[in-house]
Amino acid sequence: MTHILAIDQGTTSSRAIIFDASMNITASAQEEFAQHYPDSGWVEHDPGDLWATTAGTCRAAIEKAGLKPEDIAAIGITNQRETVVVWDKTSGQPVYNAIVWQDRRTAAYCKTLRDEGHDKMITARTGLLADPYFSATKLKWILDNVEGARDRATRGELLFGTVDTFLIWKLTGGAAHVTDATNAARTSLYDIHKGRWSQTICALFDIPQQMLPEVKDCAADFGVTRSDLFGRPVPILGVAGDQQAATIGQACFEPGMLKSTYGTGCFALLNTGDTAVASSNRLLTTIAYQFDGKPTYALEGSIFVAGAVVQWLRDGLQTIRKASETQAMAERADPNQNVVLVPAFVGLGAPYWDAECRGAVFGLTRNSGPDEFARAALESVGYQTRDLLDAMTADWQGSDVRATLRVDGGMSASDWAMQFLSDIIDAPVDRPKVLETTALGAAWLAGQRAGLYPDQAGFAASWALEKTFAPQMDAALRDRKYAAWKRAVDATLRF
C-alpha cells in the first residue's frame, strides 16, 4: 500500500488525484457536471452528479496510475464547503437537489434574523455571519419547502450533510454518517468554542439534531469504502473543507502564517492558533484544522471574484482568448492611465459583505483599451487581498500578518499578478512548487494517519518554494493607487 487517493469535490467539477509515497502526483482525473439555476440567485447541483463524477474520476485516476486495489493505502477528501444535501436514511435518495454555497434564496430570511438581533448570537457561537452563504438557512429551506421533509426529519428518516458527509455515506454504503470539524464549522449550526452542535442555534432554525452527522478530527477513521467500488475496502482517513485543506497543504501550522487561494474567488486564511479571534471587521472566525480533539482557529476573508474577473475579460468583454494573455497585456498598459475596476459582479465579500452592489469601472479615457482593462482586472485582485489583510491586521492586533503570504490556485501562476500583489500589500509573496495544495492537504491528512507520510513537523519541512515575489513599488505610488481603489469601492457601494 504505497499510494493515497485524494478526492477534490469542487463547485464545477470533481477530481481525483493519486499521490505516491513521496507525496508526488502520479495521476489525476477530472469531470465537470451541470450547474442548475432554477430561479434568480438560486444555484443547485444534482447530488447524483456529485457522486457519479466522484466515483468515476476515482476509478479513472487509479487506472491511469496503473495501480492495483491493494496499492491504495487510504483516501483523503476535500470538498466545496457549505453546500447542503438532505437524503433518506434508508434508501439514500436525496429529497432535493444540493443547494450550493453560492445560493442566495434565503437572503430575506437572513435579513429577518439580523433585524431580530439573532446575528450576534450566531456569530458568537459559530464565528460566522447571518448570511445565505452558510448551510443552516439552506437546510431550513429544504425542511420548510419540500413536501413532508420536516415531518420525515422529525421522525429520524432524513439525514443532513455537507458534500463530504454525503460522499462518505455513498462510499461506505451508508455505514458512516460523519463529517470533520472544518466542514461542521461552516454550517452555522456548530459551536466552534464548545466543539459540538449548538442546541440553541438548532432550535432557532428548527433543525432536528438527530439528522446531523458525527463530527471528527480532520485525520480520523471515517469508515471504509464498499469493496465493490475499488476492488477492496479502502479506509477514509482524512477530511477537510477545501480552503482548510489548502491551509494544511501550504503547511500553515504556526500562528501568524497566512495563505491565499486564487481560484474563481479568493479565500485568505490566517492561522490564529488556539485563540478564536472575534472579528470586528466582518471577517469569519473558523476552524483551520483539528487534531486529537484540539482545534486550531483561523480568521478567514472571502473574495467573490478573483480568477472570475479574467473569465469576464474572456467571456464578457471578449478581449482575450485565454487567461495567460493578461500578463503581456498588463505589461503593455499605459502607466499614465489610472483605470480602476471594482469587480462586484455578484456583490462584494469581506470585509464589505454587500450582496446588492454591482461592478463598476473608474478612470476611463478615450485612450483606455483592452490592455488597461486587463491590468485593472489583475490589480483588482491585489487590492481586494489588501482589504482582507488590513482587516486581519486590525483584528489580530500586535501580530504582523504581512510577514509572508503563501499563495496557490490557478491565478497564482501569473507572475505579473503576484508581483502586483506583493507590491500593493508591501510584503513578500511565496509561491510553492506544488500548486495542488488543496488535494495535497487532503492526501497528507490521510497519508499520515495511514503511517505513509511524515508527521506535521516533517510535512512542514517538506514544503518547497518555487518563487518569492518581493515588493518593488515606490511607497508613494502604492499609497496613491490603494487610495484610488478605496474611493472606487466607496462610490460603488453608494451607487
UniProtKB/Swiss-Prot annotation:
Catalysis: reaction(s): glycerol + ATP = sn-glycerol 3-phosphate + ADP + H(+)
GO molecular-function terms, A-Z: ATP binding; glycerol kinase activity
GO cellular component: cytosol
Source domain of life: Bacteria
Pfam families: FGGY_C (PF02782), FGGY_N (PF00370)
Residues annotated to bind ATP: 11-13, 264, 307, 311, 410
Residues that bind sn-glycerol 3-phosphate: 11, 81-82, 133, 242
Regulation: Inhibited by fructose 1,6-bisphosphate (FBP).
Entry's family note: Belongs to the FGGY kinase family.
Known role: Key enzyme in the regulation of glycerol uptake and metabolism. Catalyzes the phosphorylation of glycerol to yield sn-glycerol 3-phosphate.
Stated name of the protein: Glycerol kinase
Lineage: Bacteria, Pseudomonadati, Pseudomonadota, Alphaproteobacteria, Rhodobacterales
